[in-house]
Structures are given as C-alpha cells and as structure tokens.
Amino acid sequence: MRTSPRMKWFVLLFTFVFAIGMNSFRNSFQFFMLPMADAFHADRSLISVSVSIFMITTGIVQFFVGFFIDRFSVRKIMALGAVCISASFLVLPYSPNVHVFSAIYGVLGGIGYSCAVGVTTQYFISCWFDTHKGLALAILTNANSAGLLLLSPIWAAAPYHAGWQSTYTILGIVMAAVLLPLLVFGMKHPPHAQAETVKKSYDWRGFWNVMKQSRLIHILYFGVFTCGFTMGIIDAHLVPILKDAHVSHVNGMMAAFGAFIIIGGLLAGWLSDLLGSRSVMLSILFFIRLLSLICLLIPILGIHHSDLWYFGFILLFGLSYTGVIPLTAASISESYQTGLIGSLLGINFFIHQVAGALSVYAGGLFFDMTHGYLLIVAVCIVFVGLSAVIELVPFLDKQKAKETHHSI
C-alpha cells in the first residue's frame, strides 16, 4: 500500500499529541502530590510509594513489550495502554485510602503507560519513517517535555480550582473520548510491517559474558542508575521543593524546565555526533547535572537565598535531563551484537526505573526524617560526580588503545 509522503508527518503529529496525553498521567502527579497527601492524611513518603510502584511496573513491563510487538499489532498494544490509563484516571478519585490509590496508580497506570508510549510509539514511528527517522524519533522523544511545557500552568491551577479528583475524572474522559479515536482514525497502520520475528533461541552465553566481563556495560548501567535516581527525585519532588522554598513563579519555572529539557535533548544527540564520542558527551551531561545540583544545594544549605539559584538548577538540570538515555542506548547498539541489544536495552530501562523508584521513596522518607531535602540532594551529588568521571573511562581506553596501536 502506497501512501502520500505527507502522511507520515501527519501520523507523527498525531502520535506526538497522543504521547503528550499519555505522559500527562505521570507529569501531573507532582502538581497534585500535596493535595492528594492531604486528602489521604498521608505523609510525602507514603504518597510517593505510588510513583515508586509505577516506575517499577513500567520498568518490568517495558522489558517485555518489545517481544509482544513482534506477535501482536503495535496499535492494539497502544490502545490497551490508553484504555488502562483512562481507567486509572477514572477510578483513582474513588480510592478509599492511599494504599489502594498507590496500587491503582502504580500497577494499572504503570501497565497502561508501558503499553501506550515508549517502546511502542518509537517502534510505530520507526515503521513509518524510512528517511528522516532520526529527526522523527527526536521529535517524538520531546513529546513528554512539550507536555510539561504546555500543560504545567493547567496542572498547577487545577487541583486548587477544580480539585484533583475532578481533574483526574476529566482527564480520564479526555483519554477515552479524544485520544483513543485519535489512535484509531489518525495514527494509521504503517504501510509496511516489520518483517523481523522473535528469535527462537537466545545466546545466553553471550549475554552472560557481556554482563560479567564487559566494563563498558557496567559503566553505562551505573550512569543509567544515576540518571534514574536523580530524575526520579526531581520528577516527583521538584514542585514541593520550590514551594517549600517559597519560590515565586513556580508555574513559569516548570514551563521553562520543559523548554530546557527539549533544547538539551536535541543538543545532546547533535553534539555527540559532532564530538564523535558518546562517552565524552555522557560525561559532559553528568558534569552539567552536577553543577545543577550544586545550584540547588546552595539555598538548601542557607549559604545564599535567591530564586536565581533555583532558576540555575532548572536551566542546567533541564539541559542534561533527556540526553543520558538515548546516548546510552546508542552506545549499547553500537558496541554489542544485534542478538543481545534488545535484552541489554531492556535491562537498561529497568535499572533506570528501579533507580527512580528508590529515589522517589527515599526523597519522601528523608524529608519526613529531616524536614528537608539536603540528604537526598547530597546523595545525588555523590552519584552524579562519580558518573561524570567514570563515563570518561571508555574514551580513555580507546585513546590508550590507539596510542598502543600506533607505537606498534
């Protein structure tokens, strides 16, 4: 079946809008966190459990979604995800307590999110684009950030004007009445299906050799753990951090954060190609993230109180936010045999999500213990500093190997 050359760009636009809607499920949480905690008479560590469960669920489910795509229609999997997200939004307001809320948000919402976006949308767009594939995927990746940029003012105002329960109900209706039809009628099936099938045998020996002996994979996985740990705490606790510090224009800060995430994500891929080294770019990203955390640490320690420190954090953390995952994935795909890449990427995503889940809960727990975020920020600084250094090791190894080769 032949389609208009313009059709793929319309499909990308519809998928972009679809992804913004699905990402609203997790992006809106931090804006509703404090009102929800008050409604359930829960502290921050307890309400944060829902996000931890969500991140663990998505980490596990995304590992298997790629295999399901090869057996079932990707659009059916995305539709299942959209139904689960819509159902979660509609049921959550009727949760009798925080434990039921956490189970619904974390498990049902996590399954829905994993099926609706991520591996599925990337696969879907890859099937549509034979050319301009890199640009298309880069645009799609920024749907989450665009949603944060565009919708932050709504998320900030909604729980205090309409209430979080009514807001969730409205979102559930929008998912079912707008985004599901958009998927069915706008996001058409790709003109040609992927011919590849799941391998019947798996190279377990090669897999375990890589896991046990490859220093590169250990370094990349540590970096991904650091990325997930620092992103998790910021995704769930940034708005409470800013409000506790009485920062003015929190809504504007969050919108700017989304803009910096988009800019940083696009720049990271371009610069890594320009530098010719994923490792160097990863190190640079972690160094930028280290500077951002230092900006956050200064007002927390009481050294100097100014909104500019928080803006500096928003700027630098935003620029380093999305680059680590795609560059790590690129490094894995360029360094290991094809038959192992899917599993290695699945573990990569799982580590990222588990690290995020740990930090979300730890951030709430440390706050309840110390009434501040100093301890969790200090832990993040240690992880990021280590990652900024060790990500350079593969680059230095290559330079050393080149020098040895030339000397011979």
Swiss-Prot record:
Cell membrane among keywords: yes
A Pfam short name: MFS_1
GO CC terms, sorted: plasma membrane
Chain ranges passing through the membrane: 9-29, 49-69, 77-97, 100-120, 135-155, 167-187, 216-236, 252-272, 283-303, 308-328, 340-360, 373-393
InterPro entries hit by this protein: MFS, MFS_dom, MFS_trans_sf, Proton-linked_MCT
Alphabetized CDD domains for the sequence: MFS_MCT_like
Chief location category: membrane
Subcellular localization: Cell membrane
Family to which the UniProt record says this protein belongs: Belongs to the major facilitator superfamily.
Protein name from the UniProt record: Uncharacterized MFS-type transporter YcxA
Species name: Bacillus subtilis (strain 168)
Name of the coding gene: ycxA
